[in-house]
Structure formats: C-alpha cells, structure tokens
Curated annotation (Swiss-Prot):
UniProt protein name: Bowman-Birk type proteinase inhibitor B7
InterPro entries registered for this protein in UniProt: Bowman-Birk_prot_inh, Prot_inh_BBI
Originating species: Hyacinthus orientalis
Keyword Kinase (UniProt): no
Family indicated by similarity: Belongs to the Bowman-Birk serine protease inhibitor family.
Annotated site (Reactive bond for trypsin): R15, A16
C-alpha cells in the first residue's frame, strides 16, 4: 500500500490470473493505509497484528 513498507511478502494468484501480494510482517500497529488489520495468535507482548490487504503492487518495490 501507499507508504507502507513490508519486509516479508507472499504472492497470491488472484482469480483473474494476475499476481497480488500480502504482507506477512507481524507488527505492533498496522499502517494507517491498511484497511484489513487482524490481531494474530502469538505469544508476544504487545499483541502483533498483520495487514491482510491484498496489494496488486510488486512486493519487491518498497
């Protein structure tokens, strides 16, 4: 997403055939641009969140 920086990306093939990607980073607070933020089941404190937005941008670009 805009302004968000991801270290660990995962490519997911969309139904239309084009690649989309999702950030696998576990963060203490989601970036404001993230619209689908979910708390993860981790033993860490504070809690970790993952942004589940599907971003059509190339994961290699910051």
């Amino acid at each position: 997403g805009e302004g968000a920086c991801c270290n660990n990306c995962d490519f997911i093939c969309g139904r239309a055939g084009f690649s989309r990607c999702r950030c696998l980073d576990l963060v203490t607070k989601c970036h404001p641009s993230c619209s689908n933020c979910e708390m993860t089941e981790t033993p860490y404190w504070p809690c970790r969140y993952q942004c589940l937005d599907m971003d059509p941008d190339d994961c290699a670009t910051p």
